[in-house]
Amino acid sequence: MLNVMIQLLVVSLAVACAAPVLAAEQTHAQIDGTGARIRMFGQNGVGIVLYKDAVCTATYGEKVRASGSLGSAFGSLMGSVKNQAIGIPETQNTRNLHERKMIGSKPFYKEYAIEAGKPVVVEAGASSPAYWTSTPGFKSGWTCGPLLASTFVPEAGADYEVALDLDFRNSLCTLAVKRVAADGQVTPVDVAPVSKDCK
């Protein structure tokens, strides 16, 4: 068990050291106005993936797991995960990030440079682990059901944010894709549903 914890710590430190270099590289496309940027919210129990240059999840140029990896889950659980920003204006979601907090699940966001004019797919899901109680015994965890996925084509110079909004009372999950204006105001993006088999 100690070896596993040490390995997780080493991986977390390596990722933390690489993050500033990646952020510096990603901002270049946005500075010259030809690229776009996207902010993705995550936390322990929420998986969210970005597929670049894709209209489905089977064929894509690059797959970026913003949340749902072992490293991000561990960082969220321990409360050590940090936001990774490349300059997208603040929104209500970033200012009120604490409202997404759950026990053992610190919310965070990561921002990425994306190519304008090339479609992207965002895919997300959420679940909690199963657990045991004295009565009635084994209980399955909470889940959104099937993964939610949407596709859209980013515009040059535009900023976007993607979040999986969870409504536990009504057992409802919504994949919210919004465009971020320079003043931080957001508007919904016209997205299309995604097919896994690219047909």
Task: Set out the residue ranges of the language-model regions.
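N-terminal signal peptide c-region/cleavage motif recognized by signal peptidases
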Residues: A18-A19
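Short loop/turn and low-complexity linker motifs enriched in small/turn-promoting residues
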Residues: A23-T143, A149-T151, E161-K199
